[in-house]
Amino acid sequence: MKVILQLIVLTILVGCKPSAEKSKEYSWALLPFEKADEVNPVLLPDTNSTFLCPVRNTIVQWEEKDVFNPAAVVRNDTVFLLFRAEDSIGKFAGTSRIGLAWSTDGLHFKKHPVPVLYPDNDSAKIYEWEGGCEDPRIVEDENGTYYMTYTAYDGDKARLLIATSKDLYHWTKHGHVFKNDTAEVNKWSKSGAIVCKYQNGKAIAVKIDGRYAMYWGDTDIFVAASDDLINWTVLKDDKGNTTIFGPRPKKFDSDLVEPGPPAMLTDKGIVLIYNSRNV
């Protein structure tokens, strides 16, 4: 997987519209981005949406507090958003669940009435309760199965988990992405962006050197490899280092770097869009 280190190209969004002289230099960078202010926001919290929480065994207003951090995927000419939503109760004043919305134009969305992935009385509860299920990122394999990485938060640590679905409505949880590494299971981990290729409007997970690759982390950015998109191994260089890149002093990303949507394998390398924070 050394090719990962050789191919990586980073999308650094310094502005929405690069100057003409910069356009050629950043031709790989998917720029410019333009906000559709006339329709924003495309989703809002809803105090009328209710859901029977299986852990609390009571009705909760599952998206009353906020809706944010979505992942987008196209299925049957329809744009689907998997989004994080929070109620406003409990010791954290909110448990996160993942909802589903859809649109035929990518701008105007309708919501499914209940969350599609949430804390339950299952094997993932130890990681998910009661902070919840957060920040989905989604790709598809060549057989039409969707793989969603998401963050589980138990109130102490965030952990990176994965689930699969054939229809985006019904999900099977597969637990921690690093479940075969006890040391990693007990560490803070989140934000898994699996490397994919865009084919016919779909984000299809792609192998590099015979294995799938995923960028993850929210202090520094790391990379992991997998044979099946479910069980992942953290990669290290020849010196045992795991960091691909980290914050840069005195820059816009001086305090935090975190993978955004799935990384894209292009003819110019791997394009990774990441979010950041400065201090």
Residue map of PLM features:
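Sec-dependent signal peptide recognition
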Residues: 1-10
